[in-house]
Amino acid sequence: MAKKDKHDDALARNRRASFNYFIGETYEAGIQLTGTEIKSVRLGQITIGDAYITVRDQQAFLNNANISPYKQGNQFNVDPLRRRKLLLHKKEILALDRAVSKEGKTIVPLRVYIVKGFAKILIAIGTGKKNYDKRQTIKERDLKRELGKNLKNFH
């Protein structure tokens, strides 16, 4: 049996990331969550569309990721948009910090998934696309779709 890719069972995806950024090197990081937050994440109640990562004092943080409050959490629920620490090796954090210090580079979250009971996030160093780059991406996507339709109709 073929080995299953661990990124296939993503609980949340940032589908706009590849449209808005040229994706470079990727890293897998753990997310420091409270008990009710991990329960919400396992239920798929997380949104990373507007999220971004910052590096400060040799620590990486996930900002603006929305984890909905757990229904049975009551007083243990925390702010859904709070800043969450990312668990990375020191060398990885320094590499991210060096990359972001260059003009036009940012760290974008790509997807959230569970590995052996722990919440993980796939992050990447991205370079922002200009509007003409985005239009080129749309043209390529439409051309690929049209080619697929033509091949389907040909058979």
Curated annotation (Swiss-Prot):
GO terms for biological process: trans-translation. Pfam families: SmpB. Keywords: Cytoplasm, RNA-binding. One of its GO terms (molecular function) is RNA binding. GO terms for cellular component: cytosol. It is found in: Cytoplasm. Its main location: cytoplasm. Required for rescue of stalled ribosomes mediated by trans-translation. Binds to transfer-messenger RNA (tmRNA), required for stable association of tmRNA with ribosomes. tmRNA and SmpB together mimic tRNA shape, replacing the anticodon stem-loop with SmpB. tmRNA is encoded by the ssrA gene; the 2 termini fold to resemble tRNA(Ala) and it encodes a 'tag peptide', a short internal open reading frame. During trans-translation Ala-aminoacylated tmRNA acts like a tRNA, entering the A-site of stalled ribosomes, displacing the stalled mRNA. NCBIfam families: PRK05422.1 (NF003843), smpB (TIGR00086). HAMAP family: SmpB. Belongs to the SmpB family. This is SsrA-binding protein. The lineage of its organism: Bacteria, Bacillati, Bacillota, Bacilli, Lactobacillales.
